Amino acid sequence: MRDGPADQLIPAGFRIRADPGARLAGQILTGGAPVRLLRLSAAGARQVTAWWAGEPVSASTAARTLARRLLDAGIAHPMLDGAGAPGPADVTVVVPARDRLPMLAACLASLTGPGQPPVIVADDGSADPAGVAAAAAASGVRLVRRALNGGPGAARNSGFALVSTPFVAFVDSDCVVRPGWLAPLLRHFADPAVGAVAPRIVPHAPAPSWLSRYESASSALDMGPREGAVAAGGRISYLPTAALVVRAAAFGPGFAEDISVGEDVDFVWRLAAAGWRVRYEPGSAVEHQHRDRLRPWFSRRQHYGTSAAVLEARHPRAVRPFYVSRWTAAAWLAAAVGQPAAGAAVTGTATALLARRLTGVTGNRQLAWRLAFRLAAGGTLAAARPLGAAISRAWWPAAIPLAIAVPRLRLPLAALVLTPPLLDWADLRPALDPARFVAGRLLGDVAYSVGLWQGCIRQRTLYPLLPATSTSGSPRSPACQTRS
């Protein structure tokens, strides 16, 4: 992967806005995922206040450095008006395809027309190459054919080899783009450090079945309604390449051709490791034709699960089912074994120690306690959701025998497993009753878990099954380090 630009600072004149979770109290700024606490100088606090009010970033190195830090941390997001951004003439669309002719035809119909970028279809060893060629010819697009099937990564690379524009948009053949989909993505490239941007993936013409309605509300490809920076271990840790716009200068060797699953996550993580910024932009939407039959849907989820061990081999320690502080882990462990009072005591101790540390940082005891409660106590409560998801997605082969052997663990484990899907149902309000929504979530988690364990056995690794622990929430938490 090619290294990112030498100048990593935000361009002067950029505008940024606060993430909904960001809080500025005096000179203390908190926010991001994982939550960070920054102690600003008086000038820095005034600058952030001005940015939140809509003022542009000045040309000073200090301002541009701070703005970049806030964007990278997820405390702020860019306000983009299109100034300095590339246009459709700067983009070539590459569609990797293997048969699925009706889907390909629908995809090309959505991509072609007056004012649209040129399109290249990369035929990945289709069984009916004449049909793919006919679909490409009917749409008036260029075709490159691979004699042997090499997987979607290899097909994308073959298409990219013919690209001469400074940007390339990869769109899978089972996708249909909406009018105006490209402009919100291209605006991000006014920042020269941005290497890739992806839109939100939404369902295309969902069928009336319960599974289709579940996928419409909770697809594995849908990263949700909140924009953000993409980084391993962050709130948005990966992007699917069902649709992805990439700066050609950042493409480097491209997608890995020796893996058939997880090549999209691997590509995005290598981009980030090389110094490029990757963004998720839900203001642009691309429709995906989801699987709505149970067997292929289960098989696809299982296939996704096998990618974790493959990615672990390429990005050590980057794939974990659960990220937790040791204080939070101790509190939940105490509660799980029937000692909730002990768990509350652990959380209270962590909060008090953190408040003591933050008092020295902020010089304000009341503010320190508010922050400590949010970071330590609030973080412990919020951990219920990812903990329950980790049990159903990774640890159920151990959790079920444990619940059978230790009856008092049955209710806590069941509550933890059911909490995430029920909370998601309440948040999403899908066109599906809670029982079937929960059933769909748990069935998908089991499918993913089967693939996860299969991949770990093949790769002979346990790391994708192990939680990542830290001292977060303690007085020495990285989240509590001060920065001026």
Go through the PLM ranges and name each one.
Residues 2-12, 16, 20-40, 46-110:
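N-proximal low-complexity "stem/linker" segments adjacent to membrane-targeting elements
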Residues 70, 240-246, 250-254, 258-285:
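A short, conserved alpha-helix in the catalytic core of glycosyltransferases
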Residues 108-145:
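Acidic donor-binding segment of Leloir-type glycosyltransferases
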Residues 145-163, 173, 179, 184, ...:
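Glycine-rich, basic loop-to-helix element that forms the pyrophosphate-binding segment
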Residues 168:
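Short aromatic/hydrophobic "clamp" motif used to bind/position activated sugar donors
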Residues 179-213, 289:
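Conserved donor NDP-sugar-binding/catalytic core segment of glycosyltransferases
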Residues 199, 215-236:
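Short, flexible, basic/aromatic active-site loop/helix in glycosyltransferases
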Residues 281-282, 287-344, 360-444, 450-454, ...:
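Active-site-adjacent helix/loop segment of glycosyltransferases
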